[in-house]
From Swiss-Prot:
Reactions it catalyzes: a triacylglycerol + H2O = a diacylglycerol + a fatty acid + H(+)
Role this protein plays: Displays cellular triglyceride lipase activity in liver, increases the levels of intracellular fatty acids derived from the hydrolysis of newly formed triglyceride stores and plays a role in very low-density lipoprotein assembly. Displays serine esterase activity in liver. Deacetylates a variety of arylacetamide substrates, including xenobiotic compounds and procarcinogens, converting them to the primary arylamide compounds and increasing their toxicity.
Glycosylation sites: N281
Free-text tissue specificity from the UniProt record: Highest levels in liver with lower levels in jejunum and kidney.
Name listed for the protein in its UniProt record: Arylacetamide deacetylase
Entry comment on modification after translation: N-glycosylated.
UniProt gene name: Aadac
Top-level EC class as recorded in UniProt: hydrolase
């Protein structure tokens, strides 16, 4: 009897975690199911631990992910070292092959919803050493303070300090980087930070060396409207759901779950900040194919108290899509990846449109069978294709 019950429970658990309906267009569905199941198991463990008062949701996932970190080991192609730029930990990847000329420099910012991840995580270490070797570039992969221990603007400030340090002439010279060929890149929350620091840099008169390019990989760019079409469609998208993304956004600003609840209802922007909604109005910024089903409605005004306590969600340093056109106009050549089955899809699409409207040179790669986090799954054919296209653009433009 006991064995039968155990078997039954096992079958139910396997079915629960492996029953993940996927869009027909997604390639290698079983691999995607397994990856999504692992994410689901991790978030369920974190939720259970939080419910019991054992640990904060994000701290549990941080612990689980720490087992996937790797040491800064050099290989036959790349020398890897760790240091600090203005007290911010960074991992540096330098190609071993001799070069008579100065190399490109790429400053990379990892994703993880401002709460998770590190330059040492195996997926980011793999990406950085691959990029350094294939691009023949010096890659700096930066860390930054994570929530819930640190909230906005700590993440932005850490990344900006680290980038400013890298852009000093003597630092670039030390690592053999051509000051005319430096770019910034990041994925997801890292794409958010990459966009934000790039905007800040063009307004900083103290930084003489400017970025040549920015490459944003499925970036998160706004927290004002949590009900854009991709969010409405994305309750069951692989890896990143709407509810998890809202949790990441709210944790970026505070551990107060009241903000999360308001964001889930899309009732967090106060009336006095409603003018900012013009910058995220998907009815005018999205391609027609995404405007057919849902009908655009202005979010219901929220509490002024929330915005006063946690002003980050209406701050351009946290939400780069809120930048004025006169700032966007000065941005460098830009590459943006968006994925069809990603709750952040529309953030990227709206940014593409706004940059095009002000004359920025934008290359937009929309992946029809893509989903959030693909770069972090090196075993997928789709991941390899996307990374190769990313690399090709960097080779031509950086």
């Amino acid at each position: 009897m006991g064995k039968t019950i155990s078997l039954l429970i096992s079958v139910v658990l396997v079915a629960y975690y492996l029953y993940i309906p996927l869009p027909d267009a997604i390639e290698e569905p079983w691999k995607v199911v397994w990856e999504t199941a692992f994410v689901k198991i991790g978030t369920d463990l974190a939720s259970f631990g939080e419910l019991l008062g054992i640990s904060h949701f994000m701290e549990t996932i941080q612990l689980l992910m720490s087992f996937q970190e790797v040491p800064p080991t050099s290989d036959e192609h790349v020398t890897v070292m760790e240091t600090a730029f203005d007290s911010v930990p960074v991992r540096i990847y330098i190609p071993k092959r001799k070069s008579m000329a100065l190399r490109r420099g790429l400053f990379y910012i990892h994703g993880g919803g401002w709460c998770l991840g590190s330059a040492a995580h195996f997926s980011y270490d793999t990406l950085s050493r691959w990029t350094a070797h294939k691009l023949d570039a010096v890659v700096v992969s930066t860390d930054y303070g994570l929530a819930p221990k640190h909230h906005f603007p700590r993440q932005f400030e850490d990344v900006y300090r680290s980038l400013r340090w890298f852009l000093q002439e003597d630092v670039l010279e030390k690592y053999g980087v051509d000051p005319r060929r430096v770019g910034v890149s990041g994925d997801s929350a890292g794409g958010n930070l990459a966009a934000a620091v790039t905007q800040q840099l063009i307004q900083d008169p103290d930084v003489k060396i400017k970025l040549k390019v920015q490459a944003l990989i499925y970036p998160a760019l706004q927290a004002l409207d949590t009900n854009v079409p991709s969010q409405q469609e994305g309750s069951h998208f692989p890896v990143l759901t709407r509810s998890l993304m809202v949790r990441f956004w709210s944790e970026y600003f505070t551990t107060d779950r009241g903000l999360e609840k308001a964001m889930l209802l899309n009732q967090h922007v106060p009336m006095e900040s409603s003018h900012l909604l013009q910058f995220v109005n998907w009815s005018s910024l999205l391609p027609e194919r995404y405007k057919k089903s849902p009908v655009y409605k202005n979010p219901t005004p929220g509490s002024s108290e929330l915005a006063q306590k946690y002003p980050g969600f209406i701050d351009v340093k946290a939400c780069p899509l809120l930048a004025n056109d006169n700032i966007l106009h000065h941005l460098p050549k830009t590459y943006i990846i968006t994925c069809q089955y990603d709750v952040l899809r529309d953030d990227g699409l709206m940014y593409v449109k706004r940059l095009q409207n002000v004359g920025v040179h934008v290359t937009h790669h929309h992946v029809e069978d893509g989903f959030h986090g693909t770069f972090s799954f090196p075993g997928l054919k789709l991941s390899e294709r996307m990374k190769n296209q990313y690399l090709s653009w960097l080779i031509k433009n950086l």
